[in-house]
């Protein structure tokens, strides 16, 4: 089996109605992990649903999905991510021709077709403060170079990490080598962590613009400084620097 897709749902039945029909024909196996048992009632034929025995973190649910599937590649896709036709094939084809590509992500766009930057730099203390405090009001979204690569890619390009909250192809052998995702992250930063550990193990991270995914991420949560999402992100960053203290001294 070539590609297994894992979708973690926290009660996103409405989003799944749009994304699963687009995703299912592009993969060999599709598993929905329902973090809220019984919250996923209707799925396309051939899609498996596994109820989490108790509420777990996103990363822990991804690990459960990886363990319950068998594809050489695991596509982690969010309920609100809709791959365009041929997107998964483009990701897999690239990975097949680049044997050290451990993580391969698509070009992510908003529902209106505008670019959504998803290839990012590993975090620094300065960058986190710039992005997660009122300092971010000093610049327009995504125009800075502290956290993101600033131009829409036209060719495959390597980067530090790719936004796991949209759609991401991971090589199973890489996941086995680095120990999977870290389920200790409550929400946010787990995608940075898995990419960082992959990088330290010598695996490449690529964005392939021939693969396109529409992502309806609710950007409003990023605008409130003291929202629970901001606090979750800062908590995740604290865990990240405790695991990887060398990032405290990093300038980029």
Language-model segments: residues:
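Short, well-formed alpha-helical segments that are part of the catalytic scaffolds
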Residues: 12-25
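Short beta-strand/loop segment that forms part of the nucleotide-sugar
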Residues: 28-38, 48-52
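Glycine-rich, basic loop-to-helix element that forms the pyrophosphate-binding segment
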Residues: 52-69
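Short aromatic/hydrophobic "clamp" motif used to bind/position activated sugar donors
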Residues: 74
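Conserved donor NDP-sugar-binding/catalytic core segment of glycosyltransferases
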Residues: 82-118
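A short, conserved alpha-helix in the catalytic core of glycosyltransferases
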Residues: 153-155, 161-179, 184-212
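Active-site-adjacent helix/loop segment of glycosyltransferases
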Residues: 189-252
